[in-house]
Amino acid sequence: IENNIENIVNGVFLTRDLVSEPPNYLNPEKFVTEIKKLTKLGLKVDVFDHLKMKKIGMNALLGVAQGSKNLPYFVTITWKPSNSKNKNPLSFVGKGVCFDTGGISLKPAKFMEDMKYDMAGAGAVVGLMKTLALRKSKSYVIGAVALVENMPGGSAQRPGDIVKSYSGKTIEVLNTDAEGRLILADAIYYIDEQYKPELIVDLATLTGAIVVSLGNEYAGLFSNNDKLSERLIKAGEIENEKLWRFPLHKNYDKLMDSKIADIQNINYSGGAGSITAAQFLQRFLKNKTPWAHLDIAGMAWTKKDLDIIPTGATGFGVKLLNKFVEKFYE
């Protein structure tokens, strides 16, 4: 038991360390360097640079990154034990915006420093993969992180631009600060297409709207699959990383239709921002794969000391997903 707790703590602490780093230190390239250190635990790390992504058409991800001098990366992390219980991998996808100014749709200056935390989804995926490797999980698992910096440079994406995503679908970018869903669109579609996973769970500090809805007590859960949702909620209850499920519906989905592209990246009606963001992501499943989206924007960091968490990054998601894998897939 002690060893198992230590393995979990090591994953959580890695996530906290990554998420708490200042943004001038932890840019996408440095993040990749940190991920590569995990190969000594038996994890396989594959890195796509901007040239590889351009070649295969990850233009939604590349569009977000084009205003920054810090180049983007897409990284897959594989844990495949010889005795794995599952033929098709469980997959976890993390949003890794190492700093988010909002781009040309610039954020207000107040509290912008918190946007160093906008890679907390990716941080959680990396911490999870470390824990799974340390405890020699019996499940075949793929972690994937999309790493970018969203900056308002001279070459930055403009509101009104249209990009052709990896899926082939065109996206009208109405707001460059709705960027997390753009990088996840390419990441989710790639994982679904290439690995045909048993399930996909994505984690992202995706919307401010989820904080309005749930504050700092629950993360938002959105899913196309009841069984997957129930399992995630149960794991969250056990680990005190609580999830609250929101609806998905065709009427919300319609709000993301663009008049000049396949989809637009924001709905300006002003309501249900977290739901419409999830509806956007759902359109980038290639197959009918069980999928869940965790919007962790209210849970990824804390402004005050909590019982066992000091001010800063919380490491939210590592314990939850480790328990989810352990309880239901091993």
PLM regions with names:
Residues 15, 29-330:
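A generic structural signal for tightly packed, nonpolar segments enriched in small/aliphatic residues
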Residues 1-41:
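Phosphate/ribose-phosphate-bearing ligand recognition and processing surfaces
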